[in-house]
């Protein structure tokens, strides 16, 4: 019940007492004149005294409770502020760590990409060199085979020519000259 409720209760009680006293005064007894307009000063002093006496406890209790609630709310707010500051500093620290980790990962990715690029270039150079060597070996093999075929062909043609000449017969002076040359090649003297 608030101050207004107390005030209204006191006013209603004062009105009830006033009507009883007015009846008592009309019957010839002692009575208080509680008519506010007739006895303003006395009634106001009594009313203020009653309000002060009874209202002081209620008002002080209300004010103490209010003060206690405000102090509790302030303490809770300060506690939440400290928690928020702590959480903020932790979040900022985590942000710094996350940024450092992200930078480290980015740097690592750049280094890995560079290493992969260098490895690919080195492998490509090796592949080109291997292809050159393979091509050169194939070319040498083909050249040697062609030369061997040509030698075989020349030898075959030479043998065919010699056979045809032998079949046709060799003239005596050509035969003598061939024998002399063969002996000279073998290291003999004629």
Curated annotation (Swiss-Prot):
GO terms for cellular component: plasma membrane-derived thylakoid membrane; proton-transporting ATP synthase complex. It is found in: Cellular thylakoid membrane. The chain crosses the membrane at residues 34-54. CDD domains: ATP-synt_Fo_b. One of its GO terms (molecular function) is proton-transporting ATP synthase activity, rotational mechanism. Pfam families: ATP-synt_B. Keywords: ATP synthesis, CF(0), Hydrogen ion transport, Ion transport, Membrane, Thylakoid, Transmembrane, Transmembrane helix, Transport. The keyword Thylakoid applies. It is a single-pass membrane protein. InterPro entries: ATP_synth_B-like_membr_sf, ATP_synth_b/b'su_bac/chlpt, ATP_synth_F0_bsu_bac. F(1)F(0) ATP synthase produces ATP from ADP in the presence of a proton or sodium gradient. F-type ATPases consist of two structural domains, F(1) containing the extramembraneous catalytic core and F(0) containing the membrane proton channel, linked together by a central stalk and a peripheral stalk. During catalysis, ATP synthesis in the catalytic domain of F(1) is coupled via a rotary mechanism of the central stalk subunits to proton translocation. Belongs to the ATPase B chain family. F-type ATPases have 2 components, F(1) - the catalytic core - and F(0) - the membrane proton channel. F(1) has five subunits: alpha(3), beta(3), gamma(1), delta(1), epsilon(1). F(0) has four main subunits: a(1), b(1), b'(1) and c(10-14). The alpha and beta chains form an alternating ring which encloses part of the gamma chain. F(1) is attached to F(0) by a central stalk formed by the gamma and epsilon chains, while a peripheral stalk is formed by the delta, b and b' chains. This is ATP synthase subunit b. It comes from Nostoc punctiforme (strain ATCC 29133 / PCC 73102).
